[in-house]
Amino acid sequence: MRAPFSRTLIDLICEQSERYPQQPAVIDERGSWTYPQLRDRCLELASALRAAGIGRGDQVGLLVNNRAEWIEICVAVSALGAVAAPFSTWSTPRELDFLLRDSAARILITLDRLGERDYAAEFSSLFADTDRRPPALEQLVVVGESCPVGGKAYETWLASAPAFELPPPGERARPDDTAFILYTSGSTAHPKAVPNIHGAVIENGFHIGERQGLSPVDRVMLPVPLFWSYGAANAMCATFSHGSTLVLQGRFEPGPALDLIERHRCTSIYTLPAITHALISHPDFAPARTRSLRTAMTIGTPQDVATVAQVLGAREVCNVYGQTESYGNCCVTWHHWPLERRMAVQGPPLPGVRLRVIDPESGRELQAGEVGAIEVSGYLTPGYIGASATQNAEAFTADRYFRTGDLGSLTPEGDLIFKARTSEMIKRAGINVAPADIEDVLRQHPSVAAAGVTSAPDPLKGEIIVAYIVPARDTQATPESLRSHCRALAAAYKTPDRF
């Protein structure tokens, strides 16, 4: 289909509002919003942000799960030339402190609570303590029913905003401005800050949607977090650039996910091997419940791809390869290819992407069939920022290729075949985990003198986390105490599976 003309998120939503005035843009577990309704909400929020002093180049912290507010916040900031900085809702207070300081967010928009986490109480305490509060952070806005002293209730805040008209192009975001900063786990103890640029993320997202065969009739199910590039840079931009509908699940649970797919007749799903397994293993799963699925996006082994097509029922599933630095995906198979080909390769580079495989020792570019280090250029982050900016020289070549840390080869047809990871990263159930991060947490346990973390293959999760420790003198560390310690200081998915 024809690509949209717009190259910023706010302009894209405004354009699609004119093209598809009756089309739902977002559905979450509470309701549905058409493209014009989403546009109006974004402009209302932009007015509130401007009244709060937010302008060009300012960072807006975002701690919200998959719901319509996440989308409208991410889009609205671009009306002012500001930048969204989404944070993982799995982050511990210690990790959030780093994210707030590194992003220099001037305002934080957060959920009141999610599961057992009471974010409102956590941030109320933080704002009351000027010694602990990050220096750039000035304001707190809370999404939900409870709002602490010192914070502003999101809906009340929006309702009190003055009337707002979209600023002229020179005042709002430009195509070469940063749309959002995504934090991704890396080989260092802290996550890396990865800017994604408006024009590039929309263009790359459009090409991803083309590989899936998306159109305005499609409804795209998203059970994975929007704060991942797989969600924000990939699913959101692929969906909105095609006038399709994004169906959000606030927190993945297989039973409710099956309900959403069936109720809204979703035609595409962004999945991972662990999610696929959870869906098809659920006692309420039946092929009839997912018969609306046509296509999907997944990573994994050839069998993982086949399972999505043949068991889950998304017969035109796309096999993919990419990372946050390349806007979610840089290679995607075509949905209409024979399944055997989609199982065997991760597809050709997307338009505008250049990919090469080199000998990691000599730097020589390799021929088809030769296995070497994968490097990517084209639609690519301009570089890490914040504390991780020191990693740029190591991560990017002089001619602006990104060193992915992966091994692979190219077929004579130009398709990428991913072989293995060369970096130290552990990919547990599709989530990147840095060993250094876990080692740092383990070393803070009073019974640990030294710690090392590695991975082991696992048929369900791909890799699991294995930790080795040297006990401190005259102490005894039990696996139970170590797990409790890790869960207290780091997100739950970083807790080692085996000691």
Feature annotation, model-predicted:
Residues 51-52, 82-156, 473-475:
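Structural core segment of the AMP-binding/adenylate-forming
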Residues 158-159, 263-271, 280-343, 354:
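Gly/Ser/Thr-rich phosphate-binding loop
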Residues 22, 141-142, 152, 159-183, ...:
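Conserved pre-ATP/AMP-binding loop-to-beta segment of ANL
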Residues 34-36, 172, 179-203:
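Conserved AMP-binding A3 loop
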Residues 202-219, 227-268, 278, 282:
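Conserved AMP-binding/adenylation subdomain of ANL enzymes
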Residues 2-6, 10, 14, 22-67, ...:
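Conserved AMP-binding/adenylate-forming core of the ANL superfamily
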